[in-house]
Amino acid sequence: AEKQTMLEMSLTHEIGEQNLQFKPILAKLYADNKYELMWKDKAAEKQFLREYAAMVASGISKRSAQSLINLHNAEKTGGLTYDVLLSDAFLDYLYYSKNVNQQAQRWLYATNAYKPELPNQEIIDQWQSAVKNDAVSGFVNGLSNHNRLYRETVQSLPSMISASGISEMGKKLALNAQRLRVIPDFENGIFVNIPSYQLKYYRDGKAILESRVIVGKNERRTPVMYSRLSNVVVNPPWNAPTRLINEDILPKLKRDPGYAAAHNYSIL
Protein backbone atom coordinates (compact mmCIF):
# COMPACT_ATOMS: atom_id res chain seq x y z
CA ALA A 1 0.00 0.00 0.00
CA GLU A 2 2.85 2.38 0.82
CA LYS A 3 4.52 1.68 -2.52
CA GLN A 4 1.24 2.35 -4.38
CA THR A 5 0.80 5.63 -2.49
CA MET A 6 4.31 6.69 -3.51
CA LEU A 7 3.59 5.82 -7.14
CA GLU A 8 0.43 7.93 -7.14
CA MET A 9 2.26 10.82 -5.49
CA SER A 10 4.96 10.60 -8.16
CA LEU A 11 2.35 10.72 -10.92
CA THR A 12 0.71 13.76 -9.31
CA HIS A 13 4.13 15.42 -9.12
CA GLU A 14 4.57 14.86 -12.87
CA ILE A 15 1.13 16.00 -14.09
CA GLY A 16 -0.53 17.79 -11.17
CA GLU A 17 -3.97 16.98 -9.80
CA GLN A 18 -6.12 15.47 -12.55
CA ASN A 19 -9.61 13.99 -12.52
CA LEU A 20 -8.57 10.43 -13.41
CA GLN A 21 -10.77 7.34 -13.47
CA PHE A 22 -7.94 4.84 -13.03
CA LYS A 23 -5.16 6.64 -11.15
CA PRO A 24 -3.73 3.60 -9.27
CA ILE A 25 -3.02 1.53 -12.40
CA LEU A 26 -1.89 4.58 -14.39
CA ALA A 27 0.60 5.49 -11.66
CA LYS A 28 2.14 2.02 -11.93
CA LEU A 29 2.12 1.87 -15.73
CA TYR A 30 3.79 5.24 -16.20
CA ALA A 31 6.37 4.54 -13.48
CA ASP A 32 7.20 1.23 -15.21
CA ASN A 33 7.46 3.16 -18.49
CA LYS A 34 9.74 5.80 -16.88
CA TYR A 35 7.07 8.44 -17.59
CA GLU A 36 7.61 8.24 -21.33
CA LEU A 37 4.66 9.03 -23.61
CA MET A 38 2.52 6.05 -24.59
CA TRP A 39 0.69 7.83 -27.40
CA LYS A 40 3.52 8.69 -29.77
CA ASP A 41 1.58 7.10 -32.65
CA LYS A 42 -0.74 9.95 -33.69
CA ALA A 43 -2.67 7.74 -36.12
CA ALA A 44 -3.53 5.41 -33.23
CA GLU A 45 -4.53 8.40 -31.09
CA LYS A 46 -6.80 9.76 -33.82
CA GLN A 47 -8.44 6.39 -34.39
CA PHE A 48 -9.06 5.87 -30.67
CA LEU A 49 -10.52 9.36 -30.19
CA ARG A 50 -12.88 8.89 -33.13
CA GLU A 51 -14.24 5.69 -31.58
CA TYR A 52 -14.35 7.14 -28.05
CA ALA A 53 -16.11 10.33 -29.17
CA ALA A 54 -18.73 8.24 -30.99
CA MET A 55 -19.28 6.22 -27.82
CA VAL A 56 -19.58 9.36 -25.66
CA ALA A 57 -21.96 11.03 -28.12
CA SER A 58 -24.40 8.15 -27.63
CA GLY A 59 -25.07 9.34 -24.06
CA ILE A 60 -24.42 6.01 -22.38
CA SER A 61 -21.97 7.39 -19.78
CA LYS A 62 -21.64 10.79 -18.12
CA ARG A 63 -18.27 9.79 -16.66
CA SER A 64 -16.87 8.96 -20.08
CA ALA A 65 -18.19 12.29 -21.35
CA GLN A 66 -16.27 14.07 -18.58
CA SER A 67 -13.08 12.25 -19.58
CA LEU A 68 -13.50 13.46 -23.15
CA ILE A 69 -13.97 17.05 -21.91
CA ASN A 70 -10.81 16.73 -19.80
CA LEU A 71 -8.93 15.55 -22.87
CA HIS A 72 -10.18 18.46 -24.94
CA ASN A 73 -9.13 20.95 -22.26
CA ALA A 74 -5.62 19.44 -22.03
CA GLU A 75 -5.06 19.05 -25.77
CA LYS A 76 -3.35 22.42 -26.30
CA THR A 77 -0.98 21.82 -23.40
CA GLY A 78 -0.10 18.34 -24.61
CA GLY A 79 2.86 16.57 -23.05
CA LEU A 80 2.66 13.98 -20.30
CA THR A 81 -0.56 15.34 -18.79
CA TYR A 82 -2.43 14.91 -22.06
CA ASP A 83 -0.85 11.49 -22.58
CA VAL A 84 -2.00 10.26 -19.14
CA LEU A 85 -5.52 11.57 -19.76
CA LEU A 86 -5.52 9.72 -23.09
CA SER A 87 -4.51 6.50 -21.34
CA ASP A 88 -7.15 7.04 -18.66
CA ALA A 89 -9.85 7.39 -21.32
CA PHE A 90 -8.40 4.46 -23.24
CA LEU A 91 -8.72 2.14 -20.24
CA ASP A 92 -12.39 3.16 -20.12
CA TYR A 93 -12.80 2.41 -23.84
CA LEU A 94 -10.84 -0.83 -23.50
CA TYR A 95 -13.24 -2.13 -20.84
CA TYR A 96 -16.25 -1.00 -22.88
CA SER A 97 -15.09 -2.55 -26.15
CA LYS A 98 -14.28 -5.88 -24.50
CA ASN A 99 -17.64 -6.16 -22.72
CA VAL A 100 -20.26 -4.38 -24.84
CA ASN A 101 -21.24 -7.52 -26.75
CA GLN A 102 -22.32 -9.21 -23.51
CA GLN A 103 -23.81 -6.08 -21.93
CA ALA A 104 -25.50 -4.45 -24.95
CA GLN A 105 -29.07 -4.82 -23.70
CA ARG A 106 -28.16 -3.24 -20.35
CA TRP A 107 -25.79 -0.49 -21.53
CA LEU A 108 -27.30 0.60 -24.84
CA TYR A 109 -30.99 0.86 -23.98
CA ALA A 110 -30.93 3.26 -21.01
CA THR A 111 -29.37 6.69 -20.46
CA ASN A 112 -26.08 6.71 -18.52
CA ALA A 113 -26.30 2.95 -17.96
CA TYR A 114 -22.64 2.21 -18.68
CA LYS A 115 -20.29 2.58 -15.69
CA PRO A 116 -16.55 2.44 -16.53
CA GLU A 117 -14.50 -0.23 -14.79
CA LEU A 118 -10.87 -1.29 -14.97
CA PRO A 119 -10.20 -3.89 -17.70
CA ASN A 120 -8.69 -7.19 -16.59
CA GLN A 121 -4.91 -7.34 -16.26
CA GLU A 122 -4.44 -9.63 -19.26
CA ILE A 123 -5.97 -7.03 -21.60
CA ILE A 124 -3.92 -4.23 -20.01
CA ASP A 125 -0.76 -6.31 -20.52
CA GLN A 126 -1.64 -6.75 -24.20
CA TRP A 127 -1.97 -2.98 -24.57
CA GLN A 128 1.37 -2.39 -22.83
CA SER A 129 3.01 -4.96 -25.09
CA ALA A 130 1.64 -3.04 -28.10
CA VAL A 131 3.08 0.20 -26.66
CA LYS A 132 6.53 -1.36 -26.23
CA ASN A 133 6.48 -2.86 -29.73
CA ASP A 134 5.16 0.24 -31.57
CA ALA A 135 1.99 -1.66 -32.45
CA VAL A 136 -0.63 0.58 -30.84
CA SER A 137 -2.45 1.29 -34.14
CA GLY A 138 -3.02 -2.40 -34.73
CA PHE A 139 -4.17 -2.90 -31.15
CA VAL A 140 -6.65 -0.01 -31.32
CA ASN A 141 -7.92 -1.18 -34.70
CA GLY A 142 -8.55 -4.64 -33.27
CA LEU A 143 -10.90 -3.18 -30.66
CA SER A 144 -13.24 -1.65 -33.24
CA ASN A 145 -16.06 -3.36 -35.07
CA HIS A 146 -15.56 -3.67 -38.82
CA ASN A 147 -19.27 -3.87 -39.56
CA ARG A 148 -19.67 -1.67 -42.65
CA LEU A 149 -22.87 -0.05 -41.36
CA TYR A 150 -21.17 0.80 -38.06
CA ARG A 151 -18.18 2.39 -39.80
CA GLU A 152 -20.37 4.43 -42.14
CA THR A 153 -22.50 5.67 -39.24
CA VAL A 154 -19.48 6.74 -37.17
CA GLN A 155 -17.98 8.55 -40.17
CA SER A 156 -21.18 10.57 -40.60
CA LEU A 157 -21.22 11.87 -37.00
CA PRO A 158 -18.78 14.83 -37.38
CA SER A 159 -21.19 16.53 -39.80
CA MET A 160 -23.79 16.66 -36.99
CA ILE A 161 -21.54 18.48 -34.51
CA SER A 162 -21.51 22.28 -34.26
CA ALA A 163 -20.10 24.82 -31.81
CA SER A 164 -23.15 24.27 -29.60
CA GLY A 165 -22.61 20.50 -29.51
CA ILE A 166 -24.07 17.47 -31.24
CA SER A 167 -27.61 17.66 -32.63
CA GLU A 168 -30.46 15.47 -31.34
CA MET A 169 -30.35 13.54 -34.59
CA GLY A 170 -26.62 13.11 -34.09
CA LYS A 171 -27.17 11.68 -30.60
CA LYS A 172 -29.66 9.15 -31.96
CA LEU A 173 -27.26 8.25 -34.75
CA ALA A 174 -24.40 7.84 -32.27
CA LEU A 175 -26.50 5.54 -30.10
CA ASN A 176 -27.55 3.47 -33.09
CA ALA A 177 -23.87 3.24 -34.07
CA GLN A 178 -23.12 1.61 -30.71
CA ARG A 179 -25.99 -0.82 -31.24
CA LEU A 180 -24.61 -1.63 -34.68
CA ARG A 181 -21.23 -2.20 -33.06
CA VAL A 182 -22.35 -5.51 -31.56
CA ILE A 183 -23.40 -6.88 -34.96
CA PRO A 184 -20.60 -8.65 -36.86
CA ASP A 185 -19.94 -7.61 -40.44
CA PHE A 186 -21.87 -9.66 -42.95
CA GLU A 187 -22.08 -9.95 -46.73
CA ASN A 188 -25.24 -12.04 -46.80
CA GLY A 189 -28.14 -11.54 -44.43
CA ILE A 190 -31.31 -9.76 -43.42
CA PHE A 191 -31.01 -6.43 -41.58
CA VAL A 192 -34.11 -5.00 -39.89
CA ASN A 193 -34.05 -1.30 -38.99
CA ILE A 194 -36.69 -1.12 -36.26
CA PRO A 195 -37.00 2.71 -35.99
CA SER A 196 -37.56 3.09 -39.74
CA TYR A 197 -39.79 -0.03 -40.07
CA GLN A 198 -37.59 -1.34 -42.88
CA LEU A 199 -36.01 -4.65 -43.79
CA LYS A 200 -33.10 -5.05 -46.18
CA TYR A 201 -31.80 -8.31 -47.60
CA TYR A 202 -28.07 -8.25 -48.43
CA ARG A 203 -26.34 -10.60 -50.84
CA ASP A 204 -22.61 -10.24 -51.52
CA GLY A 205 -22.67 -6.97 -49.60
CA LYS A 206 -25.38 -5.37 -51.73
CA ALA A 207 -28.99 -4.68 -50.71
CA ILE A 208 -31.12 -6.56 -53.26
CA LEU A 209 -34.48 -6.41 -51.47
CA GLU A 210 -36.19 -3.81 -49.29
CA SER A 211 -39.49 -4.19 -47.47
CA ARG A 212 -41.60 -2.49 -44.84
CA VAL A 213 -42.00 -4.38 -41.55
CA ILE A 214 -44.27 -4.21 -38.51
CA VAL A 215 -42.56 -3.62 -35.18
CA GLY A 216 -43.72 -3.41 -31.58
CA LYS A 217 -44.94 -0.30 -29.82
CA ASN A 218 -42.68 1.47 -27.33
CA GLU A 219 -44.37 -0.37 -24.45
CA ARG A 220 -44.02 -3.71 -26.30
CA ARG A 221 -40.66 -3.32 -27.96
CA THR A 222 -39.43 -5.64 -30.67
CA PRO A 223 -36.38 -7.56 -29.32
CA VAL A 224 -32.98 -6.50 -30.65
CA MET A 225 -30.80 -9.45 -31.55
CA TYR A 226 -28.30 -10.95 -33.96
CA SER A 227 -28.81 -14.54 -35.08
CA ARG A 228 -28.01 -16.99 -37.84
CA LEU A 229 -30.98 -18.16 -39.93
CA SER A 230 -31.14 -21.71 -41.27
CA ASN A 231 -34.46 -21.22 -43.09
CA VAL A 232 -37.11 -18.57 -43.72
CA VAL A 233 -40.87 -19.22 -43.98
CA VAL A 234 -42.58 -16.82 -46.37
CA ASN A 235 -46.14 -15.75 -45.43
CA PRO A 236 -46.47 -18.12 -42.45
CA PRO A 237 -49.79 -18.59 -40.63
CA TRP A 238 -49.93 -16.18 -37.71
CA ASN A 239 -52.14 -15.99 -34.64
CA ALA A 240 -52.29 -12.72 -32.76
CA PRO A 241 -50.66 -12.93 -29.30
CA THR A 242 -53.01 -12.71 -26.32
CA ARG A 243 -51.59 -9.39 -25.16
CA LEU A 244 -52.01 -7.82 -28.60
CA ILE A 245 -55.60 -9.11 -28.77
CA ASN A 246 -56.49 -7.71 -25.34
CA GLU A 247 -54.71 -4.37 -25.67
CA ASP A 248 -55.12 -3.56 -29.37
CA ILE A 249 -57.69 -5.61 -31.24
CA LEU A 250 -60.54 -5.95 -28.71
CA PRO A 251 -60.77 -2.17 -28.03
CA LYS A 252 -60.99 -1.59 -31.80
CA LEU A 253 -63.66 -4.28 -32.20
CA LYS A 254 -65.71 -2.62 -29.46
CA ARG A 255 -65.57 0.67 -31.35
CA ASP A 256 -66.10 -0.94 -34.76
CA PRO A 257 -67.62 -4.46 -35.02
CA GLY A 258 -66.50 -4.59 -38.66
CA TYR A 259 -62.82 -4.07 -37.80
CA ALA A 260 -61.88 -7.78 -38.00
CA ALA A 261 -63.40 -8.28 -41.46
CA ALA A 262 -61.92 -5.02 -42.76
CA HIS A 263 -58.41 -6.14 -41.74
CA ASN A 264 -58.76 -9.78 -42.83
CA TYR A 265 -58.75 -11.21 -39.29
CA SER A 266 -60.35 -14.65 -38.82
CA ILE A 267 -61.84 -15.31 -35.40
CA LEU A 268 -61.16 -18.95 -34.47
Predicted regions: what they are:
Residues 97-133, 206, 226:
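Structured beta-strand-rich cores of soluble
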Residues 1-112:
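Cationic-aromatic interfacial patches
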Residues 1-20, 31, 91-92, 111-112, ...:
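Well-ordered beta-sheet/strand-loop patches within structured domains
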